[in-house]
Amino acid sequence: MAVYTSVSDEEVSSFLDLYPDSGRLLSIKGITEGVENSNYLITTDVRSYILTLYEKRVNPEELPFFMALTDHLAAENLPVPKAWKSRDGKQIQTLAGRPACLIEFLQGRWTPTPNAEQTRATGEMLGKMHKSLTHFSENRKNSLDLENWHILAEKCGFEAMNQIEAHMGDEVKKELDYLDKFWPKDLPRSVIHADLFPDNVLFEGDSLKGVIDFYFACTEVRAWDLAITYSAWCFDQEDHFLADHAKALIKGYHQSFALTEEERAAFIVLLRGAALRFLLTRAWDWVNTPPDALVVPKDPRDFFKRLRFYREASLESLGF
């Protein structure tokens, strides 16, 4: 979450009037974390909300898909924030020239250093979402799939990546060739979250209270979602592999939705694809963010290390 578009108290008060029983505005607080949209914590005399203004990286035409997705998951009693409907039944409005939604506020906070039990709970929740999404009929193309990794790598420049870390660009080129040959495109597909990092999961203690930020959700190889989550949760901030977290994540997932034998057999390839996807998007930001920018780009070398780790790993060493 972040703040790019400013709004006044008067604008927010008028916006709240569009919604029944929304209450009288008491406070507005910008949420500075994240990079995609502008987000505010809105407090009224009735309840709290998240006000989201969608910035240029989000296609307004895709917002109904995201609303339908979170509505579906929330209707199945999963802790996902749904968008409130205005008096005329609309979830998407306009505020300060941007598409905007008033979104349910969930209790809890994210943790930068999740423990093994929190990781297990996240795996269990991901499995519950995957089970629910077996009967969700809408689709959205993955704009960051293998085809687009090639495009992104070319735009970044292989030599530019070599400047970030020795041999990074050379190894990315080889990895793309490998994934072209071995990507398991025939595995079961569904809508996936595609960005289930610790900052998108809310906890009170070890109790999981919410899953947020579905704006990368898309239709893709389902087990790749678990591979992304694995890559985000099973390494510490110094990029050391956390075997106890890995076992906990897989255990939690299997408590609610088991991998097939084919998914299990392909999991290392999926992990390599997960590492490459985030290496490339971070490399792009690293190369293209001006030195004086207020936003500090995330380091692509973290996922370069994970990619190298996965190349040498076995399923047994990964917690299976």
UniProtKB/Swiss-Prot annotation:
Highest taxon in the source lineage: Bacteria
Matching Pfam families: APH
GO molecular function, one term: homoserine kinase activity
Ion transport in keyword set: no
Alphabetical list of CDD domains matching this protein: HomoserineK_II
Alphabetical list of InterPro entries matching this protein: Aminoglycoside_PTrfase (IPR002575), Homoserine_kinase_II (IPR005280), Kinase-like_dom_sf (IPR011009), Pseudomonas-type_ThrB (IPR050249)
EC number annotated for this UniProt entry: 2.7.1.39
Disulfide bonds: none
Pathway(s) annotated for this protein in UniProt: Amino-acid biosynthesis; L-threonine biosynthesis; L-threonine from L-aspartate: step 4/5
BP terms from Gene Ontology: threonine biosynthetic process
Keywords per UniProt: Amino-acid biosynthesis, ATP-binding, Kinase, Nucleotide-binding, Threonine biosynthesis, Transferase
TM spans (from-to): none
Family, per entry: Belongs to the pseudomonas-type ThrB family.
Descriptive protein name: Homoserine kinase
Source species of the chain: Zymomonas mobilis subsp. mobilis (strain ATCC 31821 / ZM4 / CP4)
Name of the gene: thrB
